[in-house]
Amino acid sequence: GYDTKFIDLKPGKKNDNLEVLLKPTAFEISEVVVKPKREKYTRKDNPAVELIKKVIAHKNDNQIEAKPEYQTEVYEKLSLSLDNFNPNLDKNKFLKKFKFIKNYLDTSEFNGKPILTVSVRENLSDFYYRKSPKAEKTIVRAKRMQGIDKTLDDGGGITSNLEEIFKSINIFDNNIPILLNRFVSPLSSTLATTYYHYYIMDTLDVGGDKCVDLAFVPANSESYGFTGRLYITLDGNYAVKKVLLNTPANINLNWVDKLRIEQEFKQMPDSTWVLDQENTFVNFYVVKGTQQLYAHL
């Protein structure tokens, strides 16, 4: 509002086109805190819980590990970068001599800040699997290293840390090992519905398949569980089309600050689903307090 203002009008004189300037009313607003109403989570008659139960019941029918045996070709590309890199090279007397560095700049998946890729490692291999007796074998056919990766490839330090981070995971297992810790899978046959809260968010198209977007969070935010999304097909097979896994910010993973895993699956002619694409992103330190590194597989 505005402060009240009185103006004297003189009779016998023109008073049209009169401009009156009003001063806004000055007032203070005390601090206002808005808190959303916290709804109680219930598992009974919860469509999200019923959906995840059906996904778990069908997981052995849909995953390729249910087959007696299979083999596949695997291509992996691991890039290691300096995180939160300042792209303004002109202010750095040393780096401004190397203008080509800008060609190796990328963007972090975590915060959108620039990163500088310093090494790239590529592997091409054949993977063999047998269900009973269970056996797995990987034969490397070709490998290539670029950048400072050869310096790091000493069987220890950064190399061993990266190997520990990027160990292959199976979302359908009851437990998923991450850095010597065992995380409960959101598809665990034994603990899923008691360990996690599930929420149906939306229906959407994922790679040509209509899916339910199912969000999940640990019931206890300090437990070793993931936050993320499951995209479940709506064709009656309850197959996992895509999964996003994030480690919670308030748990201790030693030298790892952030970790995200993305997997996307495709259906084969025999109706089983196989892993088609996988991306793992991680922020970590070699030594706490030093330059943070960013890795992407």
Residue ranges with predicted function:
Residues Y2, N15-N17, I29-E31, K67-E69, ...:
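Extracytoplasmic
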Residues A26, R38-D213, V217-G225, K288, ...:
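Structured extracytoplasmic
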Residues G1-K44, R260, T280-L293:
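Periplasmic N-terminal soluble interaction domains immediately after the signal peptide in Gram-negative
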Residues R43, F183-L191, Y198-D205, D209-L297:
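Gly/Pro-enriched, hydrophobic low-complexity segments
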Residues G1, F127-Y128, N237:
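Intrinsically disordered, low-complexity N-terminal regions enriched in serine/proline/glycine
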Residues G12-L21, S160, S223-G228:
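Phosphate-binding glycine-rich loops and adjacent basic patches that engage nucleotide phosphates
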